């Protein structure tokens, strides 16, 4: 009975992956789901997962012994990137060390578009930097791997951007430069992770996980205004203009600071979201979602319709 360990199920991607893994797991598979804190998972969700045969327990990327406890006897494990910017490569090394000590054969990692940028890390955009380091650690580990480079989630727009539009004078300030980007549904990223964990990918392969088409932020905004609720004005700004607007208003400069503003991203994270699109990192689509899950990727309209009460 092969054992598969899905870590980080208390988060959005991990939770989606867990539910899909239970749908597609071959008969006789052992599924172990871990979270750093069981309270992150609704009790009803835990009940459903348990009834379907999953074991749910705690483990932390910062605690190698907790990882070794759950990795023992596993064929494959996952590493879902966290919000611990700067500390993520060490968390990855902990997972790698624990996996190797337990005889795990394969690791599946949720990376990010742009992690293959050949530039020196300090010259790369902010968001892919840790991912480039982590991918290098995984390749050097000797473990078999599957890496999925997720594009920016379309879910980020209702979750992180829309709450700030009223604060900005009913405007979406965008530094994406009018360049199209293939935003992906977070749901599809979770499903891809489950598929890779359960062996649907090719060994030692990197997959770009994208939406079905590349669209501009202005197109997305126009669709929201026409189909959900008029949000005001779409305004194109430069990276520097974005900083000049937000920094005097108190937007945090580091991830560790908690924003008191409707915009909850720190300035580097916020600017980089637009930069990734503007510089063409997200211009090309892939067939990864359909190949690995058997379902076409969700469109931005599909996703935003689910968030219509947010706008």
Explain the meaning of each model-derived region:
Residues 2-30, 34-45, 62-65, 83-90, ...:
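Oxidoreductase cofactor-interface core, primarily capturing Rossmann-like NAD(P)-dependent enzymes
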Residues 68, 96, 186-194, 286, ...:
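Short, amphipathic alpha-helical "lid/cap" segments that border enzyme active or binding sites
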Residues 240-311:
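A hydrophobic C-terminal alpha-helical subdomain
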């Amino acid at each position: 009975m092969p054992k598969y360990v899905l870590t980080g199920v208390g988060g959005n991607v991990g939770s989606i992956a867990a539910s899909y893994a239970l749908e597609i797991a071959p008969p006789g598979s052992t599924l172990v789901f871990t979270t750093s804190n069981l309270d992150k998972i609704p009790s009803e969700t835990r009940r459903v997962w348990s009834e379907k045969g999953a074991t749910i327990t705690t483990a932390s990327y910062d605690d190698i012994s907790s990882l070794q406890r759950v990795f023992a006897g596993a064929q494959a494990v996952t590493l879902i990137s966290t919000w611990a910017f700067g500390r993520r490569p060490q968390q990855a090394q902990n997972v790698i060390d624990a996996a190797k000590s337990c005889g795990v054969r394969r690791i599946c990692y949720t990376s990010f578009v742009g992690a293959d940028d050949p530039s020196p890390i300090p010259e790369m955009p902010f968001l892919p930097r840790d991912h480039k380091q982590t991918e290098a650690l995984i390749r050097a580990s000797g473990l078999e791997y599957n890496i999925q480079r997720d594009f920016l989630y379309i879910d980020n727009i209702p979750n992180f951007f829309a709450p700030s539009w009223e604060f900005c004078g009913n405007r979406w300030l965008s530094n994406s430069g009018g360049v199209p980007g293939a935003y992906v549904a977070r749901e599809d990223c979770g499903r891809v992770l489950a598929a890779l964990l359960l062996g649907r990918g090719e060994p030692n392969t990197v997959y770009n996980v994208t939406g079905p088409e590349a669209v501009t932020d202005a197109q997305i905004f126009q669709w929201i205004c026409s189909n959900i609720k008029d949000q005001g004005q779409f305004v194109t700004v430069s990276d520097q203009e974005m900083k000049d607007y937000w920094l005097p208003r108190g937007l945090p400069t580091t991830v560790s600071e908690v924003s008191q503003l409707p915009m909850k991203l720190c300035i580097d994270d916020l600017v980089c979201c637009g930069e990734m699109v503007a510089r063409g990192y997200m211009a090309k689509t892939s067939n990864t979602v359909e190949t690995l899950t058997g379902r076409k990727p969700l469109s931005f309209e599909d996703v935003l319709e689910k968030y219509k009460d947010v706008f």
